């Protein structure tokens, strides 16, 4: 090995080990992945990328849709980093092209459109691409007469796109209304965290709203609310279980039971007489 080889950038090796965010136990990364990112020690549900969600929920031979719709730096926005540079870095390092990936496939032989958000892509924030992909996914569900399932995780609207990102709240809500008017079931699966403009738009417009255990779900953060109302909030405030007790979600379902639960709902809502 020469001196230049010594200084040359080495390929990044995958980490063999990881740590549970909840119980702090050290786990084999491969073990966590094969368990669909549910901690085998404490049952904590970690974030999972869209392609793993698709492999867990869908049968083989599904298609990925609308990948040609890509983000644009409309405003030449810069915070700690230029938005254009942030997108370029994500293009090189992320396994998704945006914070939402849309799949067309079958869930236990039932045709569905599946849209899945990715928190690792700028906090799962909703910008113009997320709004447009969700709209097109909903219209495809209407056109093909099959249910739309959306797995949601988000920090809210994408600040780098300013008012354009806020417009997506209206766009996605209208898309859900079109599905409702055409009798197409829309099911949302809320994962940790689901907050901000996404929770204030399509996330809570599902015909059935499912949440994963102990997910943080809400609009503003608990600390912001406490500072505003000057009151102490309940310890389990904004958790899936708290929202279930208050009637804001319909059921709390473990990730390993999600496919069977969705199959039962699809049979009940749409495919019973198929």
Curated annotation (Swiss-Prot):
Binds 1 zinc ion per subunit. A zinc finger (C4-type) spans 20-42. It is an enzyme of class 2 (transferase). It catalyses: N(6)-carboxybiotinyl-L-lysyl-[protein] + acetyl-CoA = N(6)-biotinyl-L-lysyl-[protein] + malonyl-CoA. Transmembrane segments: none annotated. Its cofactor is Zn(2+). One of its GO terms (molecular function) is ATP binding. Residues 16-274 form the CoA carboxyltransferase N-terminal domain. The keyword Cytoplasm applies. Zn(2+) binds at residues 20, 23, 39, 42. Signal peptide: none annotated. NCBIfam families: accD. Acetyl-CoA carboxylase is a heterohexamer composed of biotin carboxyl carrier protein (AccB), biotin carboxylase (AccC) and two subunits each of ACCase subunit alpha (AccA) and ACCase subunit beta (AccD). This is Acetyl-coenzyme A carboxylase carboxyl transferase subunit beta. It comes from Hydrogenobaculum sp. (strain Y04AAS1).
